UniProtKB/Swiss-Prot annotation:
Family matches, as InterPro entries: NADH_UbQ/plastoQ_OxRdtase_su3 (IPR000440), NDAH_ubi_oxred_su3_sf (IPR038430)
Record organism: Danio rerio (Zebrafish)
Protein family (similarity comment): Belongs to the complex I subunit 3 family.
Protein name: NADH-ubiquinone oxidoreductase chain 3
Gene name in the database record: mt-nd3
Compartments where located: Mitochondrion inner membrane
Keywords, in A-Z order: Electron transport, Membrane, Mitochondrion, Mitochondrion inner membrane, NAD, Respiratory chain, Translocase, Transmembrane, Transmembrane helix, Transport, Ubiquinone
Length: 116
């Protein structure tokens, strides 16, 4: 038998054995408290249409912006190997200034204030 057929037979046998063992083993400690879902302190059996705070959404929108900032600035140390490293520095500073101005605007508008 070739290697592929041997590996296929071993994988099939092992899969069947593991599936049969999982059906034969009893459920240990099946308690209603352990079988209920855990939802981080929220009632899992309540309504799914609870109002969502807009503050969470605003913070969630700000996070990817600054995450992308880090991703854009990571290759910056390799920019000095280019023909014109000052152009790379110019565009990196432009991105930083735009994001800083956006953060200052959001802060001035009160978007980062949690309690009103």
């Amino acid at each position: 038998m070739n290697l592929f057929a041997t590996i296929l037979i071993i994988m099939t046998t092992l899969s069947l054995v593991l599936a049969l063992v999982s059906f034969w083993l009893p459920q240990m400690n099946s308690d209603t408290e352990k079988l209920s879902p855990y939802e981080c302190g929220f009632d899992p059996l309540g309504s799914a249409r609870l109002p969502f705070s807009l503050r969470f959404f605003l913070v969630a929108v700000l996070f990817p912006l600054f995450d992308l900032e880090i991703a854009l600035l990571l290759p910056l140390p390799w920019g000095d190997q280019l023909n014109n490293p000052m152009e790379t520095l110019f565009w990196a500073m432009t991105v930083l200034i735009l994001l800083t101005l956006g953060l200052a605007y959001e802060w001035a508008q009160g978007g980062l204030e949690w309690a009103e």
